[in-house]
Amino acid sequence: MTHVVFAVPFAMDATLRFVEAATRLREEGLRLGVLSQDRPERFPEALRSRFDAFHRVPNAMDADLLTDGVRQLARSMGGRVDRVIGILEPLQEALAEVRERLGIPGMRPEAAANFRDKSRMKDLLRASGLPCARHRLWMGPEEAFGFGRESGYPLVVKPPAGAGARNTFRVDDEQELAGYLRTMPPRPSDPVLLEEFLSGREFSFDSVTLQGRHLLHSINEYAPTPLEVMQTPWIQWAVVLPRDISGPDYQAIHEAGPRALD
């Protein structure tokens, strides 16, 4: 029997779909504990009744509080936890800290930081021979304007550890960049990532990887691209899962996707 803790900071509908899928594995011998900062009543009763344990913490994004919460759940689940999981991207570094502290298998902090920090991720990808947009981690105005002159406009401005396309903007010239600097000034503790603007079709590559083996993957296309959606809120957008991904349009990502994970 496998004891799993699912970290669910907030009982959002999208997250609960994953929790509901996890509860189905109880028939296969899984025991499920849920760790959240929301009240138990925020979870639908039919779903909550399938939890083997539940623990609430003041802040489910804090590694120290999560660590204590996992220990509490372990006491309610036979004295051990075999896995700690969560689907929110901003949660991954904290979960990696919990696993390392408690000796639980799974992604460690270094690997989590590699994909959470987009500046670090691009440096690693480029070092491995995978092309990506030129970028600069911006902590002051001179760095920003220098990068703009070096790479040309437009530029993409975003947080280095964001999620989705939130707080992501396009600036078309130095005047717009100066305006961004006035409204959202970066600090050494809170830098901003600048990237050269690349246009084209945009895809995602999702993989199930176990101990370095890529067991399966899918490729989705954003229609239109996320940045275009953010700039034009009325657009009805979609994420398209193609039925056939064997053609030449997908050859490059078939090669680059596994290499990026390796």
Where are these regions (language model features)?
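ATP-grasp fold ATP-binding core
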Residues: L125, G148-R170, P188-G200, F205-D206, ...
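ATP-dependent carboxylate/phosphate-activation module, predominantly the ATP-grasp catalytic core
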Residues: E196-S199, F203-L261
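Hydrophobic anchor at the start of a short beta-strand
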Residues: R31-G33, C132-A133, L155, V192
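ATP-binding N-terminal substructure of ATP-dependent carboxylate-amine bond-forming enzymes
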Residues: M1-A111, E142
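Short catalytic-loop micro-motif centered on adjacent basic/acidic residues
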Residues: V5-F6, R83-G86, A133-R134, R170, ...
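A conserved helix-loop-beta module that forms one wall/lid of the active-site cleft
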Residues: E100-N167, E174
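Glycine-rich phosphate-binding loop signature in dinucleotide/nucleotide-binding domains
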Residues: L73-V81, R149-S151, P186-P188
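Short amphipathic alpha-helices within nucleic acid-binding modules
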Residues: E176-Y180
